[in-house]
């Protein structure tokens, strides 16, 4: 009876494969079809979800050496050798983005001249008309200066009418004459002091 049971078990085993065999385990796994794989768009580099583990054996993308904006997981912009050579030749990093050209033209709605530019005519200082006094006018002015170095307006007007000059010219002449008189006074005072300073060391010896 034991032999009959063993024979029946062997017949059942020959008809049905063992559930722990390699063929049975591999056949029970669901296979992903190629259209299903193609329907899933590949995620761009650098934005992979942290939950999805990376496939073992997949080479990690090398960082781009030709710009400073690429992340560590970004795809390389070119061959590693060419990118490394370009980065070694340039002393500064390349920046992405369009360069803004400098505007050298004239501003819109205005002339081509700069706002702070001033024409040559406006830089010229207005020169005063220098009055040439006659001998008679100089004598009258000097005579009044000896009497009064600071004449008032009425005195200047009377003198200007007598010597045929404007009162403004007479006032300017008195200002210049007082400045000249002060300069002569300081020069004469310093001339008197200098000989005494030079003679003092000789007297002490």
From Swiss-Prot:
Where the record puts its DNA-binding region(s)?
Answer: 126-185
This entry's Gene Ontology molecular function terms read:
DNA binding; DNA-binding transcription factor activity; DNA-binding transcription factor activity, RNA polymerase II-specific; RNA polymerase II cis-regulatory region sequence-specific DNA binding; sequence-specific DNA binding; sequence-specific double-stranded DNA binding
Q: Tell me, in one coarse class, where this protein mainly resides.
A: nucleus
| Listed GO CC annotations | chromatin; nucleus
Q: Which SUPFAM superfamilies match?
A: Homeodomain-like
Give the tissue specificity.
Detected in adult testis and pituitary, and in 9-10 week fetal tissue (thorax). Probably expressed in other tissues at low levels.
Residue ranges for the region (Disordered) are 33-58, 185-205
> Which keywords, in A-to-Z order, does the entry hold?
DNA-binding, Homeobox, Nucleus
What GO biological process terms are annotated to this protein in UniProt?
A: anatomical structure morphogenesis; regulation of transcription by RNA polymerase II
Q: Which locations, inside or outside the cell, does it occupy?
A: Nucleus
Looking up InterPro entries in the UniProt record yields: Goosecoid-like_HB, HD, Homeobox_CS, Homeodomain-like_sf
Keyword DNA-binding in record? yes
What family is reported? Belongs to the paired homeobox family. Bicoid subfamily.
Q: What does this protein do?
A: May have a role in development. May regulate its own transcription. May bind the bicoid consensus sequence TAATCC.
Query: This chain belongs to which protein, by name?
Result: Homeobox protein goosecoid-2
User: Which gene carries the instructions for this protein?
Assistant: GSC2
